[in-house]
Amino acid sequence: MEFRKNDILTLDIEDCGVDGEGIGKADGFTVFVKDAVIGDRISAKIIKAKKNYGYGRLMEVITPSPYRVKPACSIARQCGGCQLQALSYEQQLKFKEKKVRGHLERIGGFEDFPMEPIMGMEEPYHYRNKAQFPVGKNKDGKIITGFYAGRTHSIIDNRDCILGVKQNKDVLDRVIGHMEKYHVQPYDETTGKGLVRHIMIRYGFHTDEMMVCLILNGDKIPAEKALVDSLCEIPEMTSITINVNKKRNNVILGDQLRLLWGQSYITDSIGNISYQISPLSFFQVNPIQTEKLYGKALEYAGLTGNETVWDLYCGIGTISLFLAQKAKFVRGVEIVPQAIDNARENAKLNGIENVEFFVGKAEEVLPREYEKNGVYADVIVVDPPRKGCDEVLLNTILKMKPERVVYVSCDSATLARDLKVLCAEDYELMRVSTTDMFPQSTHVETVVGLQRKDT
């Protein structure tokens, strides 16, 4: 039977796709339905049809799944931030474990590998230490802020996101109130006019320090002192800055920073390591789970105090400084110069001297240091972006033959692809651990431990 756009189907949702969508079948025709939960019986309208599969819009939940829960957020279906709020947290964790295992099996070709139980959260809300709120206007001309609807740049008005810290709403109310009082216009992407583009808020979970950074299409905001005075009524306020971005693009932050009040950074800690965090710093957004993740990476590194370690894609030195406590020496590599400046500052802040940091691409720095300067590694740790590791880097790791490789990944598909290369001959997949860094979303972090086969 042929199905077409706008057809209405009754579906039993039997599986869950990698993006959290429900999967059902009608006469062999597979339909992917956003917001449907495994175990649901639903009515769905076909919005896109191919020969053997299509995409549907959830019209009605006829019989709810035992795993379906009422979303804690009233706009969960419109907002692009959460994909799994209608799924019980226990089932979210199972979905993420299955996703990682499936990628390692299908893409990596691995079988019968040891996988530890996923590390979830006791309280899977209010976990984000950073949020970036776009500012705009609704159809009535009212200033709004919140998050983009999925796959759009349409702002869903929401100042009280349940993933962020509770103090965010107070900040947003004060900034939007200031804009209304002093007739400050939000930035308009279509015209390139308007001033306020985004409001960034960062929060130190262990220090209760708060940073507000206004991203402007200009150099200053009207009545700056009045805004600073208002924000400083928030007890946790530590840093207020302006970031200037006058370019017509979708990049949030520009290069120019100006301090309005307080420090230019906040401080937070992971374990017993403290970090200075600026508006431009990369820092894991879930500090509670990051400590578990890095603890697992340290465990898989198997350090005794005699090892030389390379930490590739090291950011502001978060993993490097963790490793340095147990290693003889650690070398970190990161392409962003300011991140390396932060890493060096963080090493000084913690009195850690057995580290060295390099600015550059990991796939350029590591081959250069190995082939020209003869450096080696007992352990190599990689924590690449979603696209995974460069082929040149993987080949250099195979040439260097460290005893162990620890791979920290935010994308299990590219992880599986890279592991297939590393484990083709020289390395064995020893341990796999997953961490739920982003509850209510489909994202999951994975740590993998590899051992050289001849050791």
Label the predicted regions.
Residues 1-75, 356-357, 362-364:
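Terminal RNA-binding accessory module
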Residues 22-27, 146-149, 213-215, 343:
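Short, acidic/hydrophobic/Gly-rich beta-strand patch recurrent on exposed beta strands
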Residues 116-124, 189-190, 196-198, 202, ...:
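Short, solvent-exposed loop/turn elements at beta->coil junctions and helix N-caps
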Residues 2-10, 18, 223-455:
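Rossmann-like S-adenosyl-L-methionine
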Residues 201, 208-217, 274-278, 379:
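Short, aliphatic-rich beta-strand segments
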Residues 155-197, 217-244:
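Internal alpha/beta scaffold segment
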Residues 59-71, 77-186, 206:
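Extended interfacial segments that mediate partner engagement and assembly in macromolecular machines
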Residues 45-49, 134-138, 202-206, 451-453:
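Short beta-strand micro-motifs enriched in acidic
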